[in-house]
Structure formats: structure tokens, C-alpha cells
Amino acid sequence: MNAPSPAPDEVSFGRSADGLLVALVGETAFAMAPARDGRHYLVTAWCISRPMAEWTRGDFYGHLGELADEAAFRSAVLENSEHQRERKMLGRVEEYSRAHTPWGASQGATVYADGVTSHSTARHGGFKLSADRNRKVHFLLRTKGGWYEEDVEWAIIAVTFPHLFTAFERRCAERTIKDSWPDAWEGIFGTILLPGESREKDRRAFEQAHAQDWIVVSAIRSKHKSGFVETVATRGAKRGPGTEVRRFLVLPDEYHVGRFGFVIDEARHQVYGGPSDFVGWR
């Protein structure tokens, strides 16, 4: 007979049958899974029926990003425990719904408050705000119809109605707005985002700084030039008809894509015009 699951805000840590550091928060299971190069990832599962000591890596299917070490794993699990505790206190109500949404028929709704409803569909999902609620959204972020998709735009709801979300959700929402709509964030909050505080703003800076540089748009380990990565690059990573394209050879140890692409150093990286491993260049 299985032991009862801990309450949503209780945490249990242990080791799996294959030696992984694991944890349980309510019915959500977590594991610190090894990857290549000594890295680790936070993986999750739902409602594993066996005791913790019988879990294996194969039980986990969700992926929540990279972990630096065991301390980072424990911190992430405790953060989730706090998130679940706060979410329970918010009193969100699950309802049956077949409402029409931009992503198809609703398969269920979660009511956060009067006029703030989240819909799940077969393909996607998102929030619907009533007209009164939507008028409270800042005009720089407001959508005309009051629909906000679940991947990115949900964050607009969270920063507009922060009392309806957990601290974890609010932190994620702030990060999402800064990354996706830095101009709106700066305009609304009267601040300037510094390098590293907004992915979109950093991307623009990268593109401006490297507009005339050769940036790799495709790469493959070369069979014709052993010990090199064959790359295809264009100025500023531009694509489309009429774009000048060149190939360069790069040592594998040097080739790291980075956040926005690999910039060719013409003083170090050799222009290549020989046989290619790319289809269309042969």
C-alpha cells in the first residue's frame, strides 16, 4: 500500500532506485537528472504511484531547465512548494467550459477572479478578460479582444493583477515582460533595462553591433575537413533571396552558438570553398 502524498506545501527528499536526487511536493515529483558534460537538469512527473526509492529516470518526462548543483535542485523544489501553498490559498475555481477561444473550444476553465478566466484547449490556451478587466491593462500591453495566450501574454495578466498570482508566478511574469516587451516595461515603470535584463533588448543590441559581421546560420561537422565544423554564414545573419553567403571552417572547441548566434572572426576562421557536407553545396 502506498504512503499518502504530502500536503501541497510539504516536501520530501530522497534517492531513486538509480541514485538520482529526487523530491515530492504534493503529487508533483522532481529529479535531478544528469546530462552531458557533467550538467544536470530539473525533470518532473505527476502522480508516480510507487515509493520514492523505486522511482527511476524513466518515470520523469517534464523538463524545467538546467541546474547548477544539488543546492539549486533543493532551492527549486522548495520554491515550488511555496508556489503550490500560495496557489491553494488563492482559491482558484476549476469549471467545465466549452467556450469558443482563439485556440479552439475550451476543454476546461480556471476562474482566477470575476472577469479573469484561463482556458485550456486541445492545441493551446490562454486568458480571457472581461471588458472591464481589460481596460485596466496598460495600453502598451493591452489586446483588443481581451484574449491573452498562455506562453507569453499570460504575463500581462499577472503584472496587471498581481494579487491573483503566486510570488513565483509574479517573478516569472516580470522576467517574461522584460524579455518580450522591454519598451513597454520601461515605459510603464519608468526604468531603463540594463544589458542582461532583457533578452529582446540584448538581441537588438547584438544585431546592431554585428550588422556587418558574418554570423553562422547553419553548421555541420565536416567529413571533408577533419577536425573542423563547416559553417554557413551571412552578414548580420540575414536570410532570403539575394543574400550573400559564405562558408567558414571553425574548430569544434571554438564553436559555441551563444544566445544570438556565432560571430565569425575573419582573422581566425578560414573561408572555405571546397566539398561540402551541406545538401545543395555539393
Show where each model-derived region lies.
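A solvent-exposed interaction/effector surface
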Residues: 109-110, 117-121, 135-144, 171-198
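A short, structured beta-strand/loop element
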Residues: 48-50, 118-142, 238-248
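A short, exposed loop/beta-hairpin motif centered on an aromatic-Gly-Thr core
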Residues: 54-69, 141-149
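Eukaryotic intrinsically disordered, low-complexity regions
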Residues: 206-282
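Extended, charge-biased low-complexity segments
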Residues: 3-6, 25-29, 35-49, 58
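Short, compact, well-ordered microdomains
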Residues: 61-71, 151-196, 249-282
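Surface-exposed beta-loop interaction hotspot
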Residues: 67-108, 189-215
